Structures are given as structure tokens and as C-alpha cells.
Amino acid sequence: MGRDAIQDYVTGMGNVSFTLGYVDLTGKNNDPFESTGRIHNRKQLLLWNSATQQAASFSCSFSLSIVPAISNIPPADGMAFFLLDPKLSDVPDERKGCGLGLPLNAHSTGFVAVEFDTYLNP
């Protein structure tokens, strides 16, 4: 497995594995169950400039594919793209595959997320 150029820009946490051409968010431990992985930008994105009172503007594009690790078992949960205070960036161990890798108890500072939820919770 070679180093992909994306690793110059992002860091993996949890069960992330980097393969040339893609990032597998749950593939590092080869266990598709109860697995959570996260990548984050190496450089902090400032959303507000307090000196100029200006908000930041940015664009992002990516493609995603949520596929089963085992052909007869459908993928569960999904993934989320989110903006978060760097102090809250640790992958919570107690989540064990649920919650789309989002932080616990972030209500005091808040965060913005777009979820791609693939699991119907009854």
C-alpha cells in the first residue's frame, strides 16, 4: 500500500486506512462491525475573522461510496461531513460504530454537520 497525496492534507483517526485513490473510513482493523473512522484537515479553517468581522467562505467537493464490506451484509449508519472545534476532534471510543463518528456532548460549542445516513433506525 503506497502513500496517497491526500495524506499531505488530511490526518486519519480511528479505523481509517489510506489506499491509493481513496480513503476507507472503517477498513483499518478489517472488522466492518462497530467501526468508526475520521479524517480531518491538517490546517485549521477559520470561519470568522474577529478583526475584520468577516465570515469565511469556502467550497468543497468530494465523491463518496458507501458499500458493504461483506457482500451479503448491507452497510450501516453512513457518514457525515462536519465542521468542528479542533478541541473536540478526538474519535469517541464509546461510539463503536454508531453516531456517524460525530462527537458526543458538543452542544456547548456546537458544530455543523451534513449526514449521509444509510441506516433506518426503527
Spans of features found by a protein language model:
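Polar, low-complexity loop segments and adjacent catalytic/binding residues used for recognizing
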Residues: 1-122
